Curated annotation (Swiss-Prot):
This protein's name: U3-lycotoxin-Ls1a
Principal location listed in the UniProt entry: secreted
Gene Ontology CC entries for this record: extracellular region
Disulphide bond pairs: C48-C63, C55-C72, C62-C87, C74-C85
The UniProt record lists the keyword Signal: yes
Species name: Lycosa singoriensis (Wolf spider)
Molecular function as annotated in GO: toxin activity
Protein location: Secreted
Amino acid sequence: MKFVLLFGVFLVTLFSYSSAEMLDDFGQADEDELLSLIEKEEARAKECTPRFYDCSHDRHSCCRSELFKDVCTCFYPEGGDNEVCTCQQPKHLKYMEKAADKAKKFGGKIKKWFG
């Protein structure tokens, strides 16, 4: 019985030591990965295409508005044969942003009344 108890304590100690080392390794890897993702996001944010500008070179480069990312929309101008692509905000997303803004303002008023 003493042998089983001693062996159990040894296994628990070994397991806790190995899991602590693994967590330290994962924590360091997560921090490094997070920093690299932030750097990539900052670099990508500088290269976005503003609304109503040409996005034919990269159709996924449109900038974000407050809540949603603009969409690269392509069309043929009247009487033209060349396709034109610009970053635009779809109407349904525009209305959703307006509704969210009004809800935010209304929430601020309620908070003022009861806060």
